[in-house]
Amino acid sequence: MAESLYAFIDSPGGIAPVQEGTSNRYTFFCPESFHIPPHGVVLLHLKVSVLVPTGYQGRFMALNDYHARDILTQSDVIFAGRRQELTVLLFNHTDRFLYVRKGHPVGTLLLERVIFPSVKIATLV
């Protein structure tokens, strides 16, 4: 049985994520254009939710200065079997307005395989 990451477009403007090659990394995009004021904060709803396959967990985070300088980001863990709406918290640490355009990459999801080994009792006596 194939394992798939399910992405749901929750409302108009939501943009489907793109897998980077055959890697465990998926890129998410800004659904609308906006400005972040100087020293401001924006909570951006991506209008997309995901369902992580069984046996995996996802680590979702905003893209850092690799794509947009002077923006600090946060991350979240997404567990398998639960549909999670995605949001990105963006901070502007500059003295100028930052413009983010629709379609700009703003988030990434890394899938990690999770195993649950059984416990064995060990003793040195």
Swiss-Prot record:
It holds the Pfam family dUTPase. Keywords: Early protein, Host cytoplasm, Host-virus interaction, Hydrolase, Nucleotide metabolism, Oncogene. Its main location: host cell. Changing residue 124 to P: Partial loss of transformation. Partial loss of binding to MPDZ. Localizes aberrantly in the nucleus. Its EC number is 3.6.1.23. GO terms for cellular component: host cell cytoplasm. It catalyses: dUTP + H2O = dUMP + diphosphate + H(+). It is found in: Host cytoplasm. GO terms for biological process: nucleotide metabolic process. InterPro entries: dUTPase-like, dUTPase-like_sf. It is an enzyme of class 3 (hydrolase). It comes from the Viruses. A motif (PDZ-binding) lies at residues 122-125. One of its GO terms (molecular function) is dUTP diphosphatase activity. Plays a key role in virus oncogenecity in animals. Binds and sequesters human MUPP1/MPDZ protein in the cytoplasm, preventing it from playing a role in cellular proliferation regulation. Induces cell transformation, probably by inactivating MPDZ protein. Binds to human MPDZ. Belongs to the dUTPase family. This is E4-ORF1. It comes from Human adenovirus D serotype 9. The lineage of its organism: Viruses, Varidnaviria, Bamfordvirae, Preplasmiviricota, Tectiliviricetes.
